[in-house]
């Protein structure tokens, strides 16, 4: 494999992990903050808020996992080699 292609693949993998976890991380923080605020305002809706929060956190975490998969493909099953 060409050294330039290898370096570009490693850099792309690093960007995929970094940027792929930045957005969901911020989103998860905002979602958790909104859930805590909702619980403080309406404690009787705890079950409904918790269920919605867990589902939305799972969807956000899936985006991070997609970034990890892209990075692993670039590192170990390089399509450009």
Swiss-Prot record:
Membrane topology: Multi-pass membrane protein
Residue ranges of the TM segments: 7-27, 57-77
Keyword field: ATP synthesis, CF(0), Hydrogen ion transport, Ion transport, Lipid-binding, Membrane, Thylakoid, Transmembrane, Transmembrane helix, Transport
GO cellular component, one term: proton-transporting two-sector ATPase complex, proton-transporting domain
InterPro entries assigned: ATP_synth_csu_bac/chlpt, ATP_synth_F0_csu, ATP_synth_F0_csu_DDCD_BS, ATP_synth_F0_csu_sf, ATPase_proteolipid_c-like_dom, F/V-ATP_Csub_sf
Residue numbers marked as site, Reversibly protonated during proton transport: 61
Subcellular location: Cellular thylakoid membrane
Top-rank taxon, per record: Bacteria
Keyword Acetylation among record annotations: no
Function: F(1)F(0) ATP synthase produces ATP from ADP in the presence of a proton or sodium gradient. F-type ATPases consist of two structural domains, F(1) containing the extramembraneous catalytic core and F(0) containing the membrane proton channel, linked together by a central stalk and a peripheral stalk. During catalysis, ATP synthesis in the catalytic domain of F(1) is coupled via a rotary mechanism of the central stalk subunits to proton translocation.
Family from the record: Belongs to the ATPase C chain family.
Subunit structure: F-type ATPases have 2 components, F(1) - the catalytic core - and F(0) - the membrane proton channel. F(1) has five subunits: alpha(3), beta(3), gamma(1), delta(1), epsilon(1). F(0) has four main subunits: a(1), b(1), b'(1) and c(10-14). The alpha and beta chains form an alternating ring which encloses part of the gamma chain. F(1) is attached to F(0) by a central stalk formed by the gamma and epsilon chains, while a peripheral stalk is formed by the delta, b and b' chains.
The protein, known as: ATP synthase subunit c
Organism this protein belongs to: Synechococcus sp. (strain JA-2-3B'a(2-13))
């Amino acid at each position: 494999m060409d050294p330039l292609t290898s370096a570009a693949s490693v850099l792309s993998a690093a960007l995929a992990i970094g940027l792929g976890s930045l957005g969901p991380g911020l989103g998860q923080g905002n979602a958790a903050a909104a859930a805590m605020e909702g619980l403080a305002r309406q404690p009787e809706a705890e079950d409904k808020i918790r269920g919605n929060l867990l589902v939305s956190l799972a969807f956000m975490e899936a985006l991070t996992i997609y970034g990890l998969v892209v990075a692993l493909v670039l590192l170990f099953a390089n399509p450009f080699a």
